[in-house]
């Protein structure tokens, strides 16, 4: 599956907010002007962004945050729309329940991209079974563990140390000494951090 491999900071500048693609603990705000579009001096425009443009930008932002491409994102939205309740909230819950995201939220990877790589390289088990599909949906009660051979990887140890200092989400329980965590429950909307306006995405797909 094709993925963006260019400068991560450029994507955050394009969206005007830190997407935390380089680190979950260190903001880019001190390193670059997030309110300035990519380009030598930042692209400017006097034209007002249309409603469609605003909705499209929000969708692009969420896709980049979670590292999901268009076709897969559409499938997530279709599933969210089929489920009972708020479609936008359902969408975010599906994205947050991805295995790569849960590995990231538990602090085993410093970014979602790094967490995705750990999953793809078979460094992760779910309930004792090796899992290598980043998009696998994690269920309440599932136990996520780092495989024995990967526990000494410096990047995992460092990421977990930083995550412990910053605090874990309330919907995961992590035993750092065991390199293991439990997905306690699907997070409620209030538990999902991030500058996201999911209603704009619902409006976009409802056109």
From Swiss-Prot:
Q: Name one GO molecular function term.
A: structural constituent of ribosome
Q: Where is the composition biased (Polar residues)?
A: 42-53
Report the InterPro entries cross-referenced here: Ribosomal_uS4, Ribosomal_uS4_bac-type, Ribosomal_uS4_CS, Ribosomal_uS4_N, S4_RNA-bd, S4_RNA-bd_sf
Which Cys residues form disulphide pairs?
none
Looking at the record, which segments are called Disordered? 31-55
Task: Check the record and name the Gene3D superfamilies matching this protein.
Answer: Ribosomal Protein S4 Delta 41, Chain A, domain 1 (1.10.1050.10), RNA-binding S4 domain (3.10.290.10)
Q: Please describe what this protein does.
A: One of the primary rRNA binding proteins, it binds directly to 16S rRNA where it nucleates assembly of the body of the 30S subunit. With S5 and S12 plays an important role in translational accuracy.
NCBIfam families, from UniProt?
A: PRK05327.1, rpsD_bact
**Which family is it part of?**
Belongs to the universal ribosomal protein uS4 family.
* Name of the protein described by the UniProt record: Small ribosomal subunit protein uS4
Write down the species. Answer: Burkholderia thailandensis (strain ATCC 700388 / DSM 13276 / CCUG 48851 / CIP 106301 / E264)
């Amino acid at each position: 599956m094709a993925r963006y491999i260019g400068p991560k900071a450029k994507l955050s500048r394009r969206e005007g907010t830190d997407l935390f693609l380089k680190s979950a603990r260190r903001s880019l705000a001190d390193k670059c002007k997030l309110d300035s579009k990519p380009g030598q001096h930042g692209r400017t425009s006097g034209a007002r962004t249309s409603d469609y443009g605003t909705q499209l930008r929000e969708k692009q932002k969420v896709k980049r945050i979670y590292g999901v491409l268009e076709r897969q994102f559409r499938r997530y939205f279709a599933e969210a729309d089929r489920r009972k309740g708020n479609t936008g909230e359902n969408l975010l819950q599906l994205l947050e329940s991805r295995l790569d995201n849960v590995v990231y939220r538990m602090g085993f990877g410093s970014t979602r991209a790094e967490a995705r790589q750990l999953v793809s390289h078979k460094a992760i088990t779910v309930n004792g079974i090796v899992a290598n599909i980043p998009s696998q949906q994690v269920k309440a009660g599932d136990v996520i563990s780092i495989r024995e051979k990967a526990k000494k990887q410096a990047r995992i140890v460092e990421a977990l140390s930083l995550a412990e200092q910053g605090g874990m989400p309330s919907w995961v329980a992590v035993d750092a000494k065991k390199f293991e965590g439990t997905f306690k429950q699907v997070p409620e909307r209030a538990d999902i951090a991030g500058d996201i306006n999911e209603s704009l995405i619902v409006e976009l797909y409802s056109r």
